[in-house]
Regions:
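Glycine/small-residue-rich phosphate/adenosyl-binding loop
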Residues: 41-114
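Glycine-rich, charged/polar anion/phosphate-binding loops
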Residues: 31-35, 69-72
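A glycine-rich helix N-cap at a beta->alpha junction
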Residues: 75-81, 148-170
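C-terminal helix-cap and adjacent tail motif
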Residues: 3-12, 157-188
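Short amphipathic alpha-helical segments
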Residues: 1, 23-31, 57
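A short N-terminal beta-strand-loop micro-motif at the entrance of redox/enzyme domains
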Residues: 12-28
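Short secondary-structure boundary segments
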Residues: 89, 137, 163
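Small-aliphatic-rich amphipathic alpha-helix that forms the alpha element of a beta-alpha
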Residues: 29, 33, 85, 102-146
Length: 188
C-alpha cells in the first residue's frame, strides 16, 4: 500500500482475531517505529512487547474508565490481541541540551518522540494488514509496577496489535478549512 493510502485507510481496531503475529512481521513493524525521528536523534523511545495473557490482563486492568463514557473499549482489545506493545521514554534526553531543558516545554518532548514512533508503528501495522489503537488512558503507576519500569523512564502509550476481526467504516473528519489557518491563528 502507498503511504497516503495507508494513512487514509488506517482505523482504530479494538477487536482482534486470535491469529498470532509472527516474529518477522512484528520486527518489521518495530523497525518502522525505531526509524522515527526524535529530538536531536536522542532516540529515547523503548518498546516492551507482551504476548503473555497474564501480563495483558494486568495491563487491561490498569486501563481507566472514561470520565464521560464509562468503560474504556480499549480494555477488551488489550486482553484479546495476540500482542501488546507498550511504549516508554527515557526521561531527561528529549528536549534537553547539555543536561538542561532546551525549551519551556521541559521534559515533555519525549511525548512527541514517542508519538512519532508509535504513529510509524501503527501505520506499518496497517500497511501489513494488522490493527492497532492508541491507548493512553491508564494508570501509569500500575503499568510501571507490572512491567518493572525504572524511575528514569515514563510509560507513555500502549497498543494492542493483531489481525482485525473486521474493518470499521471511516469516522467523520473535519474539513481542511476548519483546521488550517493562514499566517496567524483564526485567519482563513
Amino acid at each position: 500500500m502507498e503511504t497516503l493510502e495507508t494513512i487514509k485507510n488506517r482505523r482504530s481496531i479494538r477487536k482482534f482475531k486470535a491469529d498470532p503475529v509472527d516474529d518477522k512481521t512484528l520486527n518489521i513493524i518495530l523497525d518502522a517505529a525505531r526509524l522515527a525521528p526524535s529530538w536531536s536523534n536522542t532516540q529515547c523511545t523503548r518498546f516492551i512487547v507482551i504476548r503473555s495473557t497474564e501480563i495483558k490482563n494486568a495491563l487491561a486492568d490498569s486501563i481507566l474508565a472514561h470520565p464521560e463514557l464509562g468503560n474504556n473499549p480499549a480494555t477488551k482489545g488489550i486482553r484479546a490481541a495476540p500482542v501488546v506493545i507498550v511504549a516508554i521514554a527515557e526521561k531527561g534526553l528529549s528536549g534537553y541540551f547539555n543536561g538542561k531543558p532546551a525549551t519551556n516545554k521541559g521534559d515533555y518532548w519525549y511525548m512527541l518522540d514517542v508519538g512519532i514512533a508509535m504513529e510509524n508503528l501503527v501505520l506499518a501495522a496497517a500497511d501489513l494488514g494488522l490493527g492497532t489503537v492508541h491507548v493512553g488512558l491508564f494508570d501509569c503507576s500500575k503499568v510501571e509496577d507490572i512491567l518493572k519500569i525504572p524511575e528514569n523512564y515514563c510509560v507513555v502509550e500502549m497498543t494492542p496489535l493483531g489481525y482485525p476481526e473486521y474493518q470499521p467504516t471511516p469516522r467523520p473528519r473535519k474539513a481542511l478549512e476548519e483546521i488550517v489557518y493562514k499566517e496567524e491563528f483564526g485567519k482563513k
